């Protein structure tokens, strides 16, 4: 099942940029139904159109995720804000974080209330004076986060944005109507994939796959896909 989320259908409190009419929108519109995407049959696919992230507004963020992993997510998870997920990613990376360490880095007041929210949402557990991440397969649902940056012309600009997208995505692609071999080679030096949508055919040069989560923004995108699915089901 594929669900497309844009500014008009986004969850409350989430910033999306309105998609403007023009040749780049036409390129993206044509690509979405023809998009080659392999995923497990029990996965859901949520396509975010121009979500607002710290690195910009990527044209598409495709999130492949397991609904079964969200079975115990509820209102406490919905109450989390991006800064909570920033602290969560820190604990996830450290595998163990003393509460005093979190206070030093994030501030005493925020560390206290954020860890309480994360604990209520079943993302972290407390043992003594240290916080530990809960089981990954119950806290992170995304198996793929694929960013797609579309452009007609301005190759350098689209390459730079695609490189920024590797901050949160497991794969980052450039979508263009046509591409040269030199441009493909340049992109692949940075692990960026290229998709050329030429009339009725699609040519793909694969992107390097990176493990998730890449950063706290991966957690933000992960939760955004889940939150968007709730709103979509309740419409």
Question: Residue spans of the language-model regions?
Answer:
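Acidic-basic catalytic patches of nuclease active cores, encompassing PD-(D/E)XK
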Residues: 2-67, 77-128, 232-235
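Non-catalytic C-terminal interaction segments of nucleic acid-processing enzymes
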Residues: 15-19, 47-48, 52-54, 68-86, ...
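Conserved catalytic cores of phosphodiester-cleaving nucleases, focusing on short active-site segments
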Residues: 60-68, 135, 143-152
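Active-site-adjacent loop/helix micro-motif of nuclease/hydrolase catalytic cores
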Residues: 71-72, 143, 153-164, 175-176, ...
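Short, contiguous strand/loop micro-motifs
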Residues: 101-102, 147-149, 170-171
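Short glycine/proline-enriched coil/turn segments at helix->beta-strand junctions
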Residues: 107-108, 167-171
């Amino acid at each position: 099942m594929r669900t497309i989320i844009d500014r008009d259908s986004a969850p409350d409190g989430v910033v999306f940029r309105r998609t403007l009419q023009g040749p780049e929108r036409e390129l993206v519109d044509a690509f979405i139904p023809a998009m080659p995407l392999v995923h497990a049959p029990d996965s859901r696919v949520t396509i975010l159109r121009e979500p607002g992230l710290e690195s910009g507004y990527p044209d598409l963020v495709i999130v492949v995720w397991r609904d079964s992993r969200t079975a115990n997510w509820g209102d406490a998870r919905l109450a989390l804000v991006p800064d909570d997920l920033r602290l969560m990613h820190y604990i996830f990376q450290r595998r163990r974080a003393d509460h005093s360490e979190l206070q030093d880095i994030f501030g005493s007041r925020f560390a206290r209330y954020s860890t309480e929210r994360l604990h209520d949402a079943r993302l972290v557990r407390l043992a003594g004076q240290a916080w530990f991440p809960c089981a990954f397969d119950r806290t992170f649902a995304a198996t793929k986060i694929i960013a797609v940056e579309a452009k007609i012309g301005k190759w350098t600009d689209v390459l730079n944005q695609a490189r920024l997208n590797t901050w949160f995505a497991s794969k980052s692609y450039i979508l263009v109507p046509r591409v040269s071999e030199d441009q493909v080679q340049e992109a692949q030096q940075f692990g960026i994939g290229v998709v050329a949508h030429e009339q009725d055919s699609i040519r793909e040069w694969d992107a390097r796959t990176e493990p998730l989560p890449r950063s706290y923004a991966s957690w933000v995108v992960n939760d955004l896909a889940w939150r968007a699915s709730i709103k979509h089901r309740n419409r």
